[in-house]
Amino acid sequence: MAFFFRPEPKMVTPEEALKGGRHPVLESPQPHTVLGTPITGPWKEGQKRVWIGLGCFWGVEQMYWKMDGVESTSVGYAGGYTPNPTYREVCSGRTGHTEIVEVVYDPEKITLAELVARGLEAHDPTQGYRQGNDVGTQYRSAFYVETGEEAETVRQIVSTYGETLKSHGFGEITTEVDVITPADYYLAEDYHQQYLHKNPDGYCPHHSTGIPCGVEA
């Protein structure tokens, strides 16, 4: 009987990363097919953004566009090195990017803490470079924000949730938290945008630990 082992994914270095393209892969973004709002702005005064990676971005985007206070969502890539990457390039593991959902929200209606807590509860943030059967650095858990203050808020929530998970027998939390700029986020191809609205029976895995985060609205 033969056994086949998949090698553990390894993060690419900047020197090893693909060079990327000169132009965005989505040059003419269309309005959100569910919310009817733009996916690239201009944003209303007071609206904020957070970039969230919980594994495959199709189901994650759907989860967030259904939340009250979320004004727009889109899917793309961030956290890596390759400019204007294609989906195929990201899936190769040679860009350093993870699959990301950009969430534009009204902080008067929903807080950053609530968005982060919902994300943590929706996946298993202890799995490193995978979510279930989706294996690769592009499926890592990540929250990217625009300011250091926001990053500290997210890190505190992630750290507390990590201790909660350990008390239930899970391993170390591996969620990445960092500050990025909007220019560090690259929109994915049009067919990925609001994918589960266009394909209601499409792939939508669930990897929740079932452990509540404890952040109250």
Curated annotation (Swiss-Prot):
Keywords: Oxidoreductase
Main enzyme class: oxidoreductase
Listed EC numbers: 1.8.4.11
Keyword Lipid biosynthesis: no
Coiled-coil positions: none
Residues spanning the membrane: none
Recorded superkingdom: Bacteria
Oxidoreductase found in the keyword field: yes
GO MF annotations in UniProt: L-methionine-(S)-S-oxide reductase activity; peptide-methionine (S)-S-oxide reductase activity
Active-site residues annotated for this sequence: C56
Cystine residue pairs: none
Sequence segments annotated as region (Disordered): 16-39
Catalytic activity: L-methionyl-[protein] + [thioredoxin]-disulfide + H2O = L-methionyl-(S)-S-oxide-[protein] + [thioredoxin]-dithiol; [thioredoxin]-disulfide + L-methionine + H2O = L-methionine (S)-S-oxide + [thioredoxin]-dithiol
Stored Pfam families: PMSR (PF01625)
GO cellular component: cytoplasm
GO biological process: cellular response to oxidative stress; protein modification process
PANTHER family: MITOCHONDRIAL PEPTIDE METHIONINE SULFOXIDE REDUCTASE
Known role: Has an important function as a repair enzyme for proteins that have been inactivated by oxidation. Catalyzes the reversible oxidation-reduction of methionine sulfoxide in proteins to methionine.
Family assignment from sequence similarity: Belongs to the MsrA Met sulfoxide reductase family.
Protein name: Peptide methionine sulfoxide reductase MsrA
Organism: Corynebacterium efficiens (strain DSM 44549 / YS-314 / AJ 12310 / JCM 11189 / NBRC 100395)
Taxonomic classification: Bacteria, Bacillati, Actinomycetota, Actinomycetes, Mycobacteriales
Gene that this polypeptide is encoded by: msrA
